[in-house]
Amino acid sequence: MKTLILLIQFFTRIPIPIAINMDEVNLKKGSALLPFVGLIIGAWNWLVFTLVALVMPLPVAIIAGLFAEIIITGGFHVDALADTADGLFSSRKKERMLEIMKDSRVGANGVIAICFYFLFYGALFLSVPSAYEIGWLFFVLPIVAKGVTMLLFAKMTYAGSNEGLGSIFLGVPWWPIAISQLFVLFILGLVFSYIGLLAYAGVILFTIIYRTFVYKRIGGMNGDTLGAGGQMGQLVCLFCLVLVWGLI
């Protein structure tokens, strides 16, 4: 329970007034609960979307659902997406890329990445067959994002100094990763049947490609690339679901 509270405090802005000492060993073992944090975020997103959809047009409800995640997470991983885009697409050497990611200012690549991320997200949501399924997507996608993050923890090499937030998860054992993937697959299968499982296969393929690209650019992962991977992973899952729905 302490590990779950610590993960909630780490990845969200949910106010839990309990001071817990950072135990990296137990945090790594308890990282199997990370998709459950995604479930909490997803439940909040679903609630906001559903309530707004009762009184407002669907596009407005979709925007509200997207904004709900920014509220509960503080835009933690959206900021990581911007930093990652600024760094990896700066055409600089590895050391300079890492410096750019640490810079609190957002560059042109970061702004472009965020704009197209949300435009693509909104367009895909509007392509979903029904509002009922959109609600379920708001619930499921944050779970997928945390599943992708867990995959990126596997045999992770940390880029730069080991003082960043992401370095806490260096050396996560294989079994929390396996448990997290089973949980994600269970939720996707329960909600979307075999279509959800097919979509996650696409997510796994994306994760492999993304990991390979990042390692070639900066030699490993850091907090920004981990967060960006989760954000893009849920977008890829949504894309795959819409693609399969369009084919069947």
Swiss-Prot record:
Pathway membership of this protein? Cofactor biosynthesis; adenosylcobalamin biosynthesis; adenosylcobalamin from cob(II)yrinate a,c-diamide: step 7/7
The listed locations are:
Cell membrane
- Family under the similarity heading: Belongs to the CobS family.
| Essential cofactor(s) | Mg(2+)
| InterPro entries, per database record | CobS
**Cellular component annotations (GO), alphabetically ordered:** plasma membrane
Q: Which UniProt keywords apply?
A: Cell membrane, Cobalamin biosynthesis, Magnesium, Membrane, Transferase, Transmembrane, Transmembrane helix
User: Reaction catalysed by this chain?
Assistant: alpha-ribazole + adenosylcob(III)inamide-GDP = adenosylcob(III)alamin + GMP + H(+); alpha-ribazole 5'-phosphate + adenosylcob(III)inamide-GDP = adenosylcob(III)alamin 5'-phosphate + GMP + H(+)
Tell me where the transmembrane regions lie.
24-44, 47-67, 70-90, 106-126, 134-154, 165-185, 186-206, 228-248
Supply the source organism for this entry. Listeria welshimeri serovar 6b (strain ATCC 35897 / DSM 20650 / CCUG 15529 / CIP 8149 / NCTC 11857 / SLCC 5334 / V8)
- The keyword Phosphoprotein is annotated on this UniProt entry: no
Which Pfam families does UniProt cross-reference here? CobS (PF02654)
In Swiss-Prot or TrEMBL terms, this protein is called: Adenosylcobinamide-GDP ribazoletransferase
Give the Enzyme Commission number.
2.7.8.26
Q: Which GO terms describe its molecular function?
A: adenosylcobinamide-GDP ribazoletransferase activity; cobalamin 5'-phosphate synthase activity
Subcellular location, principal? membrane
